[in-house]
């Protein structure tokens, strides 16, 4: 999937933990805090999932037949069918995680918290501007970097009332997602489309594939047509009037079981 110069990758990882509750100085707290552990990890992984085979190679295909030689003989033409990218390299994700796990009140209550930062570099995407020579075929490219960071919390309680056992558990997670770099040759990349109209975009400073479009302002009482904000006061709706309409990626999620 990659050219020979970038075919191999090295993706290290390391993790460690410290069970503080097993230390001698912690003994006075064990009646309340049954177990307390700190965790930390860092690692990288590589991905080529977005690439098909030989994406770095320009493919040739048989074209039309043309009368280019004497004697009414025809010659078959050959032309590029796809444009390869010989600078492709691994998409790399690097994640740091810091966490704490605790059991309290003889194990009846459990609590955990994690803080994570995940940075994806050299994100592999397609949909870049096609070559005019070979028509609408696009080339994959290591187009940008993405940052994800947030917190994860979980709190639970379990106990018995006579022969009846019960447990309650809740969780909360936050996430900030942002494109932190985009190849200078690109302004934004199109994502999902509907009836050939782009709905989502990949753009620096915004969440991954955020919704970009016109701001609805109401209904024209005379015609019944929808109206939209003319943000640049040009008198017409243009691409410059489109704005950030939000993201499909939630800022936080939660659950109770």
PLM feature spans:
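Extracellular/periplasmic, surface-exposed regions of secreted and cell-surface proteins
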Residues: 1-203
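Flexible glycine-rich, low-complexity coil/linker segments exposed to the extracellular/periplasmic environment
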Residues: 63-83, 195-247
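Basic, gly/Ser/Thr/Pro-rich low-complexity segments located predominantly at protein N termini
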Residues: 22, 48-51, 104, 149, ...
């Amino acid at each position: 999937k990659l050219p020979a110069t970038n075919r191999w990758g090295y993706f290290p990882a390391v993790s460690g933990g410290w069970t503080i509750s097993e230390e001698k100085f912690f003994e006075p707290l064990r009646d309340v805090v049954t177990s307390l552990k700190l965790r930390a990890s860092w690692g990288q992984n590589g991905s080529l999932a977005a690439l098909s085979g030989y994406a770095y190679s320009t493919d040739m295909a048989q074209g039309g037949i043309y009368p280019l030689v004497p004697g009414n003989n025809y010659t078959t033409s050959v032309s590029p069918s796809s444009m390869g990218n010989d600078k492709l390299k691994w998409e790399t994700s690097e994640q740091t995680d810091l966490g704490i796990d605790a059991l309290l009140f003889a194990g009846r209550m459990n609590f955990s918290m994690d803080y994570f930062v995940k940075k994806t570099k050299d994100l592999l995407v397609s949909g870049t501007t096609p070559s005019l020579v070979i028509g609408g075929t696009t080339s994959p490219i290591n187009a940008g970097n993405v940052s994800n960071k947030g917190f994860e919390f979980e709190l639970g309680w379990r106990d018995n009332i006579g022969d009846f056992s019960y447990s309650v558990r809740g969780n909360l997670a936050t996430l900030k997602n942002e494109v932190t770099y985009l190849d200078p040759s690109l302004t934004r990349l199109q994502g999902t489309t509907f009836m050939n109209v782009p709905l989502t975009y990949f753009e620096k400073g915004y969440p991954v594939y955020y919704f970009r479009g016109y701001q609805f302002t109401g209904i024209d009482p005379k015609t019944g047509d929808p109206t939209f904000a003319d943000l640049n006061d040009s008198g017409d709706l243009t691409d410059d009037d489109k704005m950030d309409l939000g993201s499909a990626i939630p800022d936080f999620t939660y659950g109770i079981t």
